[in-house]
UniProtKB/Swiss-Prot annotation:
It is found in: Secreted. Expressed in the coagulating gland and in the dorsal part of the prostate. Not expressed in the brain, heart, kidney, liver, lung, muscle, pancreas, spleen, stomach, testis and thymus. This is Protein-glutamine gamma-glutamyltransferase 4. Glycans are attached at residues 151, 219, 288, 456, 491. Ca(2+) binds at residues 377, 379, 429, 434. Its EC number is 2.3.2.13. It comes from Mus musculus.
């Protein structure tokens, strides 16, 4: 053959801008092409001469971190399909050939090498595709796709059910190295497993946790001197970028940080995801669908008996996908949780667990549905432990059937507001459906289950949980209800602790005891504790603290006892931020912040910071101490590097006051 007639590939143009716009991947900060499976993309091939009918033109795609690789070989001349892929010649003009390639809707996701004949055309990423109706992560609503795939900022919801606080969070799934980091973490999957969002999401969930050899190390000790305190993080980006560069675990995280990086990773690879908060979240170590709390007669928790716990809140991630591994009816949202709590198949992970199975009490549906069901549905039993002639006697004094799994929350689609999604997880408390679900999950008849969790107390107790301005005295309003109006003497005992959101008690603040005579069918009792009992202990651990405890009321004549618990979160409002509404790329803008120390103690280890995806780096400013009553003002100059609406988060942090923040969206023009 005349060498002048040999077909030679001079170049392959992957039409990066054109394809990225069509595939909703323009925001990824990588020089490589990013595509979504099941959708057409275009290649422009430059030849040494016009293509002729007898010429052989083959396009080969290979992927996989294990041998043998996943390989697809296509012939645009014949247009035959291979593994669901197809290529066609869309246009031919002289030495230019335009190829339209359609990848399979169930193709392996990950990095691909592309070759046209012997010409190496580079590397691209192939993602799951919620826009493709044949993809198992298909999501029909454009508004939901914009939120759960494309939105790179959002909120975590924290606090407790009666005082929900929002924490701005930057997911940053399009930032530099994030996509590469996510696919690097999937090395343990076989090539064919990379087709399946169930297996990919479970693997990503596993690898977010350093205990499994992954990204983030959990720590709830209050000592974070050799890392970053969990409450300091407001973005997934520095965590995943640090792990990508160092290949070492990042220190430290707690549940909302694990959810943040998991949501980022899932959105990055194309699986719709949302961070979800469950308030009053049960941790049932015995898997008996109850949380058992044991108290002494003053209301103090007995640690060696109390193995279960109730977290003020717990944050996990929901991912959207079809469950082709389960019977019909379990598609849609699935719970995934990277927080290291329980071992599942040899590693710390939870899910994916279908919300429909959780709601129906079908705890046998994989994965880990029993654990999630108890978090949102369990009953809380409070036991009084009495010492009687050197023997302990446990007396059940409270059964709470509606105190766990409250106000399950996520960011609303298209709005910077909280959405309550509790009814996606469970039927209304006390409804016939809820009783049937509890019976199904527990394996007991519904009547038996209902009776076993009912106490016929003549006295009922509740507490009004007010917010607590940091530095103010503690005020508790106890309400006692009964059927009789006969005067009765009642002993009240309230034990309060400074503790973390998981219920981990750092110090006991004291016991308030009071004997009152109640009249009528409803009475109120007021308990107080001076701020000095807690204010000097705020800096003892590097965690955001709450006040929590139990209250026991005893009718003196009959000895009948009832109990309830209380939680108080601190508020601190002496913080203001001023920043412009508009700015320009590469032109400095000034942010001014003021903070007043209203406490009677000095604040130490002060740090102000400004974060935004519109900035090249986080900006920070530090000061050792702010004396009582002192106001400090700082100005920080920031230079935006990205155009468009950019969210700026300004934070104040100290050893005693953990994270006060403000946020504002600034419109940055070119």
């Amino acid at each position: 053959m005349d060498s002048r007639n040999v077909l030679i590939i001079y170049a392959v143009n992957v039409e990066r801008k054109l394809n990225a716009a069509a595939h909703h991947t323009s925001e990824y900060q990588t020089k490589k092409l990013v595509l979504r499976r099941g959708q057409i993309f275009t290649l422009k091939v430059i030849l040494n001469r016009p293509l002729q009918p007898q010429d052989e033109l083959k396009v080969t795609f290979t992927s996989g971190q294990r041998d043998p690789p996943y390989m697809v070989e296509l012939d645009p001349v014949t247009s035959y399909r291979s593994k669901g892929w197809q290529v066609k010649i869309a246009k031919q003009s002289g030495v230019e050939v335009i190829l339209n390639v359609i990848s399979a809707a169930d193709a392996v996701v990950g990095r691909y090498k592309m070759r046209v004949n012997e010409y190496k055309a580079g590397v691209f990423y192939l993602l799951f595709n919620p826009w493709c109706s044949d993809d198992s992560v298909f999501m029909a609503s454009e508004e939901e796709r914009a939120e759960y795939i494309l939105n790179d900022t959002g909120y975590m919801y924290m606090g407790f059910a009666k005082q929900i606080k929002e924490k701005p969070w930057t997911f940053g799934q399009f930032e530099k190295h994030i996509l590469s980091c996510c696919f690097n973490l999937l090395f343990q999957l076989e090539n064919n497993e990379m087709q399946n969002p169930v297996l990919v999401s479970r693997a990503i969930c596993t690898m977010m946790c350093a205990a499994n050899g992954g990204v983030l190390m959990g720590n709830w000790t209050g000592d974070y001197a050799d890392g970053t305190a969990p409450y300091v993080w407001t973005s997934s980006v520095p965590i995943l970028q640090q792990h990508y560069v160092t290949r070492m675990p990042v220190r430290y995280g707690q549940c909302w940080v694990f959810s943040g990086i998991l949501t980022t990773a899932l959105r990055a690879v194309g699986i719709p995801a949302r961070s979800v908060t469950n308030f009053e979240s049960a941790h049932d170590t015995e898997k008996n669908l109850t949380v058992d709390i044991y108290l002494d007669e003053s209301g103090k928790t007995i640690p060696h008996l109390t193995k279960d716990s109730v977290w003020n809140f717990h944050v996990w991630t929901d991912a959207w996908m079809k469950r082709q591994d389960l019977p019909h009816g379990y598609d849609g949202w699935q719970v995934l949780d990277s927080t290291p709590q329980e071992i599942s198949d040899g590693g710390f992970r939870t899910g994916p667990s279908p919300l429909t199975a959780i709601r129906q009490g079908l705890i046998q549906m994989k994965y880990d549905t029993t654990f999630v069901f108890t978090e949102v549905n369990g009953d809380k039993f409070i036991w009084l432990v009495k010492q009687n002639q050197e023997r302990e006697k446990n007396i059940l004094i409270a059964v709470e059937t509606a105190s766990l799994g409250k106000k399950i929350s996520t960011k609303m689609v298209g709005e910077n507001r909280r959405e309550d999604i509790t009814l996606q997880y469970r039927f209304p408390e006390g409804s016939p459906e809820e009783r049937k679900v509890m019976a199904k999950a527990s394996g007991k008849p519904s009547d038996d289950k209902l009776n076993s969790r009912t106490l016929n107390n003549s006295l009922q107790i509740s507490v009004l949980q007010n917010s607590l301005e940091l530095g103010a005295p503690i005020y508790l309003t106890i309400t006692l209800k009964r059927k009789t109006a006969t005067p009765q003497n009642v002993n009240i005992s309230c034990s309060l602790n400074l503790q973390t959101y998981t219920g981990n008690k750092k110090t006991n603040l004291g016991v308030i005891q009071k004997t009152v005579q109640i009249h009528g069918q409803e009475s109120r009792v007021f308990l107080t504790m001076d701020a000095s009992y807690y204010i000097y202990k705020l800096g003892m651990v590097d965690d955001e603290m709450v006040i929590g405890g139990f209250i026991i009321a005893e009718i003196v004549d009959s000895g009948e006892r009832v109990a309830t618990d209380t939680t108080l979160c601190f508020l601190y409002s002496a913080f203001s931020v001023e920043m412009p509404s508009t700015g320009k790329v590469k032109q400095p803008l000034v942010i001014t912040s003021k903070f007043t120390n209203t406490l009677p103690i000095p604040l130490t280890n002060i740090k102000f910071s400004v974060e935004s995806l519109g900035l090249a780096n986080m900006k920070s400013w530090e000061q050792e101490t702010v004396p009582p009553g002192k106001t400090i003002t700082f100005q920080m100059e920031c230079t935006p590097v990205k155009a468009g609406p950019q969210k700026f988060i300004v934070k104040f942090i100290s050893r005693q006051v953990k994270e006060v923040h403000a946020e504002k969206v600034v419109l940055i023009s070119k």
